[in-house]
Amino acid sequence: MIKYLYVILLGLLLSGCQPAEVVEIEASPKAQKRTVLKVGTLYGPQIYVNNSQGETGFDYEMANRFADYLGVSLEMIPFTDRKQLFKALKDNDIDIIAAGIAKTPGRGEQFKMGPTLYKVNQVLVYREGTPEPKDIGTLSGEITVMSNSSSVNTLTQLQKDYPELLWNQVNDKDNEELFALIAKGELNYTISDSNSLLINQRFLPELRAGMILEEKIEVVWLLPPKNSDKLMSQLLAFWHNEQRAGTLEHLNEKYFGHVKRFDYVDTRAFIRAIDNVLPAYRSLFETYSGELDWRKLAAASYQESHWNPNARSKTGVRGMMMLTQPTASYVGVSDRTDAEQSIRGGAIYLKDMIERLPESISDSQRIWFALAAYNIGMGHVEDARRLAVSMDMDPDAWRDVKKVLPLLQQRKYYKQTRYGYARGSQAVHYVDSIRRYYDTLVWVDNQTKKMEVIEAPVEILADKVDANDNIKQSLASDSKTNNTLKPKLGAGQP
């Protein structure tokens, strides 16, 4: 409720003859000094995740930096229902929505929109092994999307050109659940932003990107329609600062830069290896990784040898971590084909690379520089960093150095360096591959932990229906409600 402060100018007391004047001043309930930034969000690998490793995600990191900029604490409030998320913002229960939300006309009418964080395409998603659709007009009734998502807006716009286009909307499933049903063959098609699809292909390689339905959609934060002018001005100032500092580019590279390249066969093989090969060596990775996340060490090992203790290359490197003979001697490995010795030695060498890096490189990025050095040598990595400086780029930012490394293959550039020619593009591919393997390992590890919680203790869950049955039954229920219903123009928009 808006409070009114009545300020009486004591004119009579001051002049002794003037009548009193009453001035009415409106004070917003939000005018009190902010102490907490309440951010509504959705769960998702690129948006917000809270697990044993802590809170991560593009939107989380940006929100955390914004809270620091404001000098307040951050409270992330995850929602599982988009409709409730939007309602919370309208009701001023939260200050901002930071959830990978696409900019649409409907949202622009209801909320204030922050500046663009990044852009995505809306793509049709289908299953590997099924024909790729060529005409959206032939898919009436076969597309399933989330209610209150930008996919509904895309379909509504397409419906103007394809009047018979119909689709299904579900309220109780997110993108990841729809992806899983597509991968199983239980749904035919859905619509997703390109970044979400690329990330989830690392876990569900059966997913395929079909036709692009809408290009370069802006992803933004949402603010309340009223009493948020000050917060919006602060957000704009913060955004300009972060853009100048390269933070947006850094986070885009961190969360999306390594997922652009997708290999169906390789991803399928890796997921099988996690089930069939990794269990024999997991304890060794955990033992020798030390402070390093064991999954990064395991991902590096898979990139090197596909977890084959007897792996051997034409250049003479051998074993799980593909050590050269000089490196093996340096780290105390006598038998490079002994899995435990190789993993221990590889971990020692990788940690040595991390420690040799300049302190100016942040902790979160040191591992990527170290892996590049593991692949082509520390000298070449330092050459790339020096080249970055000469090109007015940041030598401590992996996003910049990964652009420079391929230049070490061009005489124009490597003749300026101390260590000469190097296959820099190979090092970039090497690091990106490890990052993708790591993402998949994290996802599988988290899913395993969730299943352990679900499955134990058995007596508590005796009356529960199998999770897959729940999904099928729920989807069937939704289909009865939404199946091939033609929504009104703009239906499903917040």
From Swiss-Prot:
Its main location: membrane. This is Membrane-bound lytic murein transglycosylase F. Residues 473-494 are annotated as: Disordered. The N-terminal domain does not have lytic activity and probably modulates enzymatic activity. The C-terminal domain is the catalytic active domain. The lineage of its organism: Bacteria, Pseudomonadati, Pseudomonadota, Gammaproteobacteria, Alteromonadales. It is found in: Cell outer membrane. It catalyses: Exolytic cleavage of the (1->4)-beta-glycosidic linkage between N-acetylmuramic acid (MurNAc) and N-acetylglucosamine (GlcNAc) residues in peptidoglycan, from either the reducing or the non-reducing ends of the peptidoglycan chains, with concomitant formation of a 1,6-anhydrobond in the MurNAc residue. Keywords: Cell outer membrane, Cell wall biogenesis/degradation, Lyase, Membrane, Signal. It is a peripheral membrane protein. The gene is mltF. Residues 1-20 form the signal peptide. SUPFAM superfamilies: Lysozyme-like, Periplasmic binding protein-like II. Residues 260-494 are annotated as: LT domain. GO terms for molecular function: peptidoglycan lytic transglycosylase activity. It is an enzyme of class 4 (lyase). Its EC number is 4.2.2.n1. InterPro entries: Lysozyme-like_dom_sf, MltF, Solute-binding_3/MltF_N, Transglycosylase_SLT_dom_1. It comes from Shewanella denitrificans (strain OS217 / ATCC BAA-1090 / DSM 15013). The active site is at residue 304.
